[in-house]
């Protein structure tokens, strides 16, 4: 897992989420504020994350609710504009995530130069979005066709708002996912953004695949990050950086700094 330190400059990295507000075509897009407001808000939140000392950032269309499993082209185009307008200000490694579409995530990575993506790329799930099917072979072939062999894949095997259809132990899912798909990172999530990752499940996954990186994907807090990083190889963190730790609120610099001070004290 030497690539983790090479990519993020540290072991056990904290990847901060920059949750982009609703975009054109999304039901809750602010048409009065327009894309200019979306970009301005993304810039404010990104700069707070970067100044707060996070190791990397991941831009996602987090407010494109309700989510699609096949993202519309306008959404990817608007996300490319957001990242493109911020690109000159980005001084840390960054990734992208188009919820919930790995193909669109790869397309956005190709457009922006992102170093990693995160998505659901294997398994079949009963979810809030309907029956959720995947095709990892086609996804990885799309990655290679786009010339993105160096883009790291953060592979979520416990997706939010969904349950694996087959009655298989999580250890078995982790092992076969690694064997069949060679993911760079396995992500373990809670039930929604901001919901705690079950540390027992996290430990079971890590014990099952000790030579593969495992990241906690949701719900990391100042009070829990020490325990989480005692198990995981890194964490994706978003909601806890926001005012009062609430999903709908905006990132606060002081919360980011306090969290990262804690991380620096334990790693």
Residue ranges and their predicted role:
Residues 20-23, 104, 108-184:
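Conserved anion-binding
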Residues 14-17, 53-66, 94-98, 119, ...:
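Short beta-strand segments at enzyme active-site cores
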Residues 16, 49, 57, 117, ...:
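Conserved, mostly hydrophobic/aromatic
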Residues 10-11, 16-17, 68-96, 134-154, ...:
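Alpha-helix-loop-beta-strand connector modules within alpha/beta enzyme cores
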Residues 53-78, 124-129, 183-196, 243-246:
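Glycine-rich, proline-tolerant flexible connector loops at the mouths of alpha/beta enzymes
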Residues 96, 101-114, 172-173, 205-237:
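Catalytic cores of alpha/beta
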Residues 141-142, 161, 221-226, 232-267:
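Alpha/beta catalytic cores of nucleotide-metabolism and tRNA/nucleoside-modifying enzymes
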Residues 19-44, 94-101, 155-171, 216-221:
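Active-site mouth loops of central-metabolism enzymes
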């Amino acid at each position: 897992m030497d690539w983790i330190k090479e990519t993020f400059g540290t072991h056990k990295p904290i990847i901060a989420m920059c949750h982009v507000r609703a975009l054109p075509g999304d039901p809750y897009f602010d048409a009065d504020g327009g894309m200019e407001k979306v970009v301005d808000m993304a810039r404010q939140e990104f700069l707070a994350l970067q100044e707060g000392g996070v190791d990397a950032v991941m831009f996602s269309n987090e407010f494109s609710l309700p989510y699609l499993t096949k993202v519309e082209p306008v959404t990817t185009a608007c996300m490319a504009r957001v990242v493109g307008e911020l690109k000159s200000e980005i001084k840390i490694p960054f990734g992208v995530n188009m919820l919930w579409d790995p193909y669109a995530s790869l397309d956005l990575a190709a457009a922006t130069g992102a170093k990693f993506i995160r998505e659901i790329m294997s398994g079949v799930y009963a979810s809030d979005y309907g029956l959720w099917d995947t095709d990892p072979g086609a996804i990885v072939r799309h990655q290679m066709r786009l010339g993105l062999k160096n883009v790291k894949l953060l592979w979520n095997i416990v997706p939010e708002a969904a349950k694996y259809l087959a009655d298989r132990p999580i250890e078995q899912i982790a092992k076969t996912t690694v064997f069949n798909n060679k993911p760079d990172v396995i992500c373990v999530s809670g039930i929604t953004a901001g919901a705690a990752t079950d540390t027992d499940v996290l430990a079971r996954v890590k014990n099952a695949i000790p030579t593969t990186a495992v990241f906690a994907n949701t719900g990391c807090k100042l009070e829990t990050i020490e325990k989480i990083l005692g198990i995981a190889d890194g964490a994706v963190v978003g909601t806890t950086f926001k005012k009062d730790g609430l999903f709908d609120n905006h990132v606060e610099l002081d919360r980011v700094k306090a969290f990262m001070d804690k991380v620096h004290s334990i790693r």
